Structures are given as structure tokens and as C-alpha cells.
Amino acid sequence: MTQRTLRGTNRRRIRVSGFRARMRTASGRQVLRRRRAKGRYRLAVS
């Protein structure tokens, strides 16, 4: 039987790649800027 090797947790997902996490750093804000420029419907996971 195969095993589930990846079990993501929502808390970590939000902490690492949520909107507020992106806003916290300069490079994160750059990510948001790029995604806005590209016209993404969702800027960050949250």
C-alpha cells in the first residue's frame, strides 16, 4: 500500500504564504506587486 508522504497543514500554509506573511518582508511585498501587475485574482493564500 502506498503512503501519504505529504500532509500539509493550513496553519503553516497561511503563516508561510499568506497575505500578512507576504507584507511582512520587502521581498514578500515584491511578490504581491508582481502578482498585482500580472492581474492575479488571488494575490496570496489566505
UniProtKB/Swiss-Prot annotation:
Annotated GO CC locations: ribonucleoprotein complex; ribosome
UniProt-annotated stretches for the region Disordered: 25-46
Keyword Ribosomal protein applies: yes
UniProt xrefs under Pfam families: Ribosomal_L34
Stretches with biased composition (Basic residues): 31-46
Molecular function as annotated in GO: structural constituent of ribosome
Keywords from the named record: Ribonucleoprotein, Ribosomal protein
Gene Ontology biological process terms, A to Z: translation
Family: Belongs to the bacterial ribosomal protein bL34 family.
Name of the protein described by the UniProt record: Large ribosomal subunit protein bL34
Lineage, broadest ranks: Bacteria, Bacillati, Cyanobacteriota, Cyanophyceae, Synechococcales
Gene: rpmH
